[in-house]
Amino acid sequence: DADMDQAVDAAMGAAYGSAGERCMAISAVLAVGDDTADRFVEQLAPKVRALKIGQYDEPGVEMGPVITAESKARIEGYIDQGEKDGADVVVDGRGLKLQGYEDGFFVGGTLLDRVTPDMSVYRDEIFGPVLSVLRPQSYDEARQLVMDHEYGNGTAIFTRDGDAARDFATSINIGMVGVNVPIPVPVAYHSFGGWKASMFGDHSIHGMEGVRFYTRLKTVTARWPSGIKEGAVFNFSAGSEVQ
């Protein structure tokens, strides 16, 4: 029941911004039901093909190169493996060559459909401009896929149903949750950090957790009795003494 135009635009920016090389980039969309998935892929694919790719400092460029040749090879290797595993390569970004930058580390926007949970393109963090579409047949199945994933940094639900949004936000085992927000990075006075394999250290970064990280706790236990009495105290009660 999501606004499809909004969901498609959100996926574009969240998946392909910074060439997908950021910890909060989305790498998978769980489109509930085949009709929803068909409409989503049909609307998204031409936008991915139309991405303007080049040097980041060139006017109008929407996506630049990945960081190293090794990253380019690794990302294209994931696309290769996804295709071998049975995913539909709807938009293929492999082998992209730009005039004047033939040796550049460019990978075009890639869209994979009919991905399944056992595929490495879904299980692993690719850190590249690759978006996988899975097709769970119900809300419960989609939520369970998120719950079962190894990583738990961020997730989002796109819906007009407030009950579904509330259920998702309260029950999901993910550190940062968006409701109709594709990249749920909170403002600085809230904590930033994931759960499960996406957790780092024992505190999150921002908010009160950040203050705690830079705080060394000290406990002081004191009494100011009315008069000093002799004798040992054998319990923790401040008002009881045994002489």
Set out the residue ranges of the language-model regions:
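Short, solvent-exposed loop/beta-turn-alpha elements that line the ligand-binding surface or hinge
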Residues: Y122
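Glycine-rich nucleotide-phosphate-binding loops and adjacent flexible coil segments
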Residues: P129
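A short acidic/histidine/glycine-rich donor-binding loop in glycosyltransferase catalytic cores
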Residues: G82, V133, T155
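Cofactor-binding beta-sheet edge motifs in enzyme active sites
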Residues: I126
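C-terminal core of ALDH-fold dehydrogenases
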Residues: F40, R94-D113, Y139-I228
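A structural signal for short, well-ordered beta-strand elements
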Residues: T68, S132-Q137, F158
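ALDH superfamily catalytic-core signature
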Residues: D1-T116, L145, V179, S226-E230, ...
